[in-house]
Amino acid sequence: MSKEDNVINSFEEQANELMKERFQKLKELQSNGKDPFDVYKVERTHTSKEVKDNYEDLEGKTVTVAGRLMSKRVHGKAGFSDIHDRYGKIQLYIKINDVGEEKLKEYKTFDIGDIISVTGTVFKTKTGETSIHITDFQLVCKSLRPLPEKWHGLKDPDLRYRQRYVDLIINQDVRDTFIKRTAIIKSMREFLDNRGFLEVETPILSPIAGGAAAKPFITHHNALDIDMYLRIATELYLKRLIVGGFEKVYEIGKNFRNEGIDIRHNPEFTAIELYEAYADYNDMMEITENMIAYICEKVLGTTKVEYEGAEIDFTPPWRRLTMVDAVKEYAGVDFNIIKNDIEARTIAKEKHIEFKKELKDCTKGDVLIGLFEEFCEDKLMQPTFICDYPVENSPLTKKKRGNEAFTERFEGFVFGREVCNAYSELNDSIVQKERFMQQLKERELGDDEAYMMDDDFITSLEVGMPPTGGLGIGIDRLIMFLTDTHSIRDVILFPTMKPQPNNQ
C-alpha cells in the first residue's frame, strides 16, 4: 500500500468517527424541532460579491447571505467565521450580546461544511475586511460527511475526479477553470451567431457511426430491435442540413468514442462542428484563427497565453504549412520525389514507422501521415495549420486543386497537439460512394476505425449540396490551452472513471 493510500485510509477512518458525531448533532436538532432538511427556501438578498462590490451603499444596512461554512473562529462570547458561495467568500462576526447565549451556543455546534443563512448588518473590521455582523442565522443543510482539511487526504487525482463536488468546494482554481470553460463556450457561440450561423441539434443515437475514423459505442434499441451507435461526430447530419438550405450551421455537443483514456482523450468529449455553404477550407482557416482570437480576448483579455511554462500566441494569422513541407522540414524526407507506394514503404522501414495494418498494405499517403505523426507533430508548438492531407486518408474531402493526390483538408496544431480539423467538403455523391467503398476495404483489412457506408448521406448528396467548408474543434483540448491545464480530466467536470468496488 502506498503512502498516499495510507493517508486516504487514515482520513476515511477519522471521517467515520466525525460522521457519527455529526449524525448525533442532526438527531438533536431534529428532536428540538430544528431539522435543517425541513428548510425549503432561503430569502437571500445578496451574494458575497454583491455585498463587497456595493459596500458604500450597504454599510450599516441589513442583508441576508447564504453559503457553506468554511472556517470558524468562535471562542468565548464572540468570534469570526467565513462562508463561501458561488461568487467567493465573506466574513461573519457573531457576538453574544446580539444573538443571545442559546443562539451562540447553537452556532458553536456548527461544523465546517454546514450550509447556513445569515442575516446581519454590513461593516468593515479594523483591518478593512468587509464583514457581516450577525443578528440572526439558520442552519439550512447539515453536512454529514466532513471535508478534507485543505484537501489533505485527497491528493490522489482519481479521488478528486470521482468526488468533483468536494474538489469544487475546496479548490478555487478548479472552480475558476470551469467558470472559464463556460465563458469560452459562450464566446464561441457569440462569434458564430454574430456571423449569421444557426445553432442546431442532431441525433446522438444513430443507426450508423459516421463522420470520423473512430471506434463507436454500440447499444440496442429494444422497440426497433436494431443496434444503434452513440455518435462519434456530428458531420454527416450537419451536411444534410446544408443540403436542406441551412447555409451556415453549427452544433456544440457531446461525441463518444470507445477508445483509450489518457491526458488528451476522454471517451465522452465536447466538440463543435460548423459548416458554411459556398465556402472552402481557406475560409475555415480564417474562421478558426479569428474565433479563437476572439475567445482569448473576450475571456482572457489577450491572445498570448501561457501553457506549461511556454507562451502561445493565438494572434492571427497562424502559420500555414503543407504536410509534405512539414515532413521535409522535420523528417528530412521529400515526398515530392517519391514516385509510388513501394518507395514510400522503403522509407517507412528505414525510419522505423509502425502502422495499424501491415506495411505491405500501406499506401504512399499512409507513410506520409506516419512520418508526420512521428517526426513533426511535437515540433508544432505555436498555432499552425497543417494543410493538404493524402486523398486516401480523407474520405469526406474534396481533392486539392492542382494536385489530386491530396485533399483540401487541414488540421490545426498547438503545442504539438491537434485542436481542429477542417475540409473543403466533398459534395460529389459518386466520388463519395467510391470513397466509402474504399473505406469498407480498409475495414476488411482490420481497420475498425474506417468509415461505414451511409446510404442516406449519399442520397442527400444526390439531391445536391453546394460547395461547403466544414470545421471541427475539440473544445476540451482548446480549454486546456486557455486555462493552462495539463490533463483533459481537469477541464471535464465528471471525466470517465473506472467504477470502484462498493466498499471503497
From Swiss-Prot:
It is found in: Cytoplasm. Mg(2+) 1 binds at residues 411, 418. The gene is lysS. GO terms for molecular function: ATP binding; catalytic activity, acting on a protein; lysine-tRNA ligase activity; magnesium ion binding; transferase activity; tRNA binding. One of its GO terms (biological process) is lysyl-tRNA aminoacylation. Mg(2+) 2 binds at residue 418. GO terms for cellular component: cytosol. It holds the Pfam family tRNA-synt_2. It catalyses: tRNA(Lys) + L-lysine + ATP = L-lysyl-tRNA(Lys) + AMP + diphosphate. This is Lysine--tRNA ligase.
